[in-house]
Amino acid sequence: MGRQASLTLDCSLFSGSIADIITAFNQIGWGYQGDIKEYLPLHDDDMFDYRADSISVGELLELINEKQACGELCGVVLYDQDSDRGIHLLAKDTKEITLNLMINRKTICGGFTDISWYIEHIAAGLEETGCIVQSLEYDEFI
Protein backbone atom coordinates (compact mmCIF):
# COMPACT_ATOMS: atom_id res chain seq x y z
CA MET A 1 0.00 0.00 0.00
CA GLY A 2 1.31 3.45 -0.89
CA ARG A 3 1.32 6.59 1.14
CA GLN A 4 -1.96 7.97 2.38
CA ALA A 5 -2.58 11.61 3.16
CA SER A 6 -5.56 13.46 4.56
CA LEU A 7 -6.51 16.96 5.54
CA THR A 8 -9.21 17.51 8.17
CA LEU A 9 -11.01 20.85 8.32
CA ASP A 10 -13.42 22.45 10.78
CA CYS A 11 -15.73 24.79 8.84
CA SER A 12 -18.53 24.88 11.44
CA LEU A 13 -18.28 28.66 11.93
CA PHE A 14 -19.26 29.08 8.27
CA SER A 15 -22.20 26.66 8.19
CA GLY A 16 -23.59 23.51 9.76
CA SER A 17 -24.58 22.22 6.32
CA ILE A 18 -22.22 19.88 4.49
CA ALA A 19 -24.01 20.85 1.26
CA ASP A 20 -22.95 24.49 1.87
CA ILE A 21 -19.33 23.37 2.25
CA ILE A 22 -19.50 21.36 -0.99
CA THR A 23 -20.97 24.43 -2.71
CA ALA A 24 -18.00 26.48 -1.43
CA PHE A 25 -15.64 23.84 -2.86
CA ASN A 26 -17.47 24.13 -6.21
CA GLN A 27 -17.01 27.92 -6.10
CA ILE A 28 -13.23 27.58 -5.77
CA GLY A 29 -12.91 25.18 -8.69
CA TRP A 30 -13.38 21.74 -7.14
CA GLY A 31 -16.06 19.96 -9.14
CA TYR A 32 -17.01 16.80 -10.94
CA GLN A 33 -15.98 14.76 -13.98
CA GLY A 34 -18.44 16.14 -16.51
CA ASP A 35 -22.03 15.28 -15.64
CA ILE A 36 -21.00 12.33 -13.47
CA LYS A 37 -21.13 12.78 -9.70
CA GLU A 38 -19.41 10.20 -7.47
CA TYR A 39 -20.96 9.96 -4.02
CA LEU A 40 -21.91 7.68 -1.15
CA PRO A 41 -25.59 6.75 -1.59
CA LEU A 42 -28.29 7.15 1.05
CA HIS A 43 -28.47 4.29 3.59
CA ASP A 44 -25.18 2.72 2.44
CA ASP A 45 -24.33 1.53 5.99
CA ASP A 46 -20.76 2.91 5.71
CA MET A 47 -19.90 0.34 3.03
CA PHE A 48 -18.01 3.00 1.00
CA ASP A 49 -19.61 1.69 -2.19
CA TYR A 50 -19.46 4.92 -4.19
CA ARG A 51 -22.07 5.46 -6.85
CA ALA A 52 -21.29 7.32 -10.09
CA ASP A 53 -24.41 8.79 -11.67
CA SER A 54 -25.35 11.53 -14.09
CA ILE A 55 -27.30 13.69 -11.63
CA SER A 56 -27.48 17.45 -11.23
CA VAL A 57 -25.55 19.32 -8.56
CA GLY A 58 -28.92 20.19 -7.00
CA GLU A 59 -29.87 16.51 -6.76
CA LEU A 60 -26.48 15.70 -5.24
CA LEU A 61 -26.82 18.45 -2.63
CA GLU A 62 -30.35 17.24 -1.76
CA LEU A 63 -28.94 13.75 -1.21
CA ILE A 64 -26.15 15.18 0.97
CA ASN A 65 -28.75 17.06 3.05
CA GLU A 66 -30.77 13.84 3.49
CA LYS A 67 -27.70 11.84 4.53
CA GLN A 68 -26.66 14.52 7.02
CA ALA A 69 -30.20 14.65 8.47
CA CYS A 70 -30.04 10.86 8.95
CA GLY A 71 -26.65 11.14 10.70
CA GLU A 72 -24.92 9.25 7.90
CA LEU A 73 -21.41 9.76 6.61
CA CYS A 74 -21.57 11.99 3.53
CA GLY A 75 -19.02 11.38 0.82
CA VAL A 76 -18.36 12.96 -2.54
CA VAL A 77 -15.42 12.88 -4.96
CA LEU A 78 -14.23 16.29 -6.14
CA TYR A 79 -11.67 17.18 -8.79
CA ASP A 80 -9.59 20.33 -9.12
CA GLN A 81 -10.73 21.82 -12.42
CA ASP A 82 -7.23 23.23 -13.15
CA SER A 83 -5.25 20.01 -12.63
CA ASP A 84 -5.63 16.24 -12.51
CA ARG A 85 -5.87 16.19 -8.68
CA GLY A 86 -8.87 14.84 -6.80
CA ILE A 87 -10.10 14.32 -3.26
CA HIS A 88 -12.64 12.24 -1.40
CA LEU A 89 -14.58 14.59 0.91
CA LEU A 90 -16.07 12.71 3.89
CA ALA A 91 -18.12 14.26 6.70
CA LYS A 92 -20.94 13.67 9.16
CA ASP A 93 -20.91 17.35 10.13
CA THR A 94 -18.93 20.49 9.31
CA LYS A 95 -16.76 20.30 12.45
CA GLU A 96 -14.77 17.43 10.98
CA ILE A 97 -14.49 17.30 7.20
CA THR A 98 -11.89 14.78 6.09
CA LEU A 99 -10.31 15.19 2.68
CA ASN A 100 -8.52 12.07 1.49
CA LEU A 101 -5.84 13.34 -0.89
CA MET A 102 -5.75 10.21 -3.00
CA ILE A 103 -6.40 11.04 -6.64
CA ASN A 104 -3.12 12.00 -8.34
CA ARG A 105 -1.80 13.29 -5.01
CA LYS A 106 0.59 16.22 -5.51
CA THR A 107 4.00 15.28 -4.14
CA ILE A 108 7.42 16.77 -3.51
CA CYS A 109 10.80 15.09 -3.01
CA GLY A 110 10.73 11.63 -1.52
CA GLY A 111 7.07 11.15 -2.37
CA PHE A 112 5.83 13.33 0.48
CA THR A 113 2.58 15.18 -0.10
CA ASP A 114 2.96 18.80 -1.20
CA ILE A 115 0.66 20.01 1.58
CA SER A 116 1.28 23.66 0.73
CA TRP A 117 -0.42 23.06 -2.67
CA TYR A 118 -3.52 21.70 -0.91
CA ILE A 119 -3.58 24.53 1.63
CA GLU A 120 -3.34 27.08 -1.19
CA HIS A 121 -5.91 25.36 -3.43
CA ILE A 122 -8.38 24.42 -0.70
CA ALA A 123 -8.08 26.18 2.68
CA ALA A 124 -7.01 29.58 1.33
CA GLY A 125 -9.58 29.36 -1.46
CA LEU A 126 -12.38 28.52 0.98
CA GLU A 127 -11.46 31.47 3.17
CA GLU A 128 -11.65 33.76 0.11
CA THR A 129 -15.29 32.68 -0.38
CA GLY A 130 -16.08 33.53 3.25
CA CYS A 131 -15.89 29.93 4.45
CA ILE A 132 -13.96 30.18 7.70
CA VAL A 133 -11.56 27.29 8.28
CA GLN A 134 -11.41 27.23 12.08
CA SER A 135 -8.84 24.45 12.22
CA LEU A 136 -6.82 22.33 9.84
CA GLU A 137 -5.06 19.05 10.58
CA TYR A 138 -2.80 17.14 8.20
CA ASP A 139 -1.85 13.45 8.40
CA GLU A 140 0.41 11.37 6.20
CA PHE A 141 0.93 7.65 6.64
CA ILE A 142 3.88 5.91 5.06
What do the PLM-derived regions correspond to, one by one?
Residues 22-24, 52, 71:
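Alpha-helical protein-protein interaction elements
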Residues 54-142:
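Charged interaction segments
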Residues 23-29, 48, 115-121:
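Generic alpha-helical propensity signal that fires on short helical segments
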Residues 33-68:
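Structured domain cores in non-transmembrane regions
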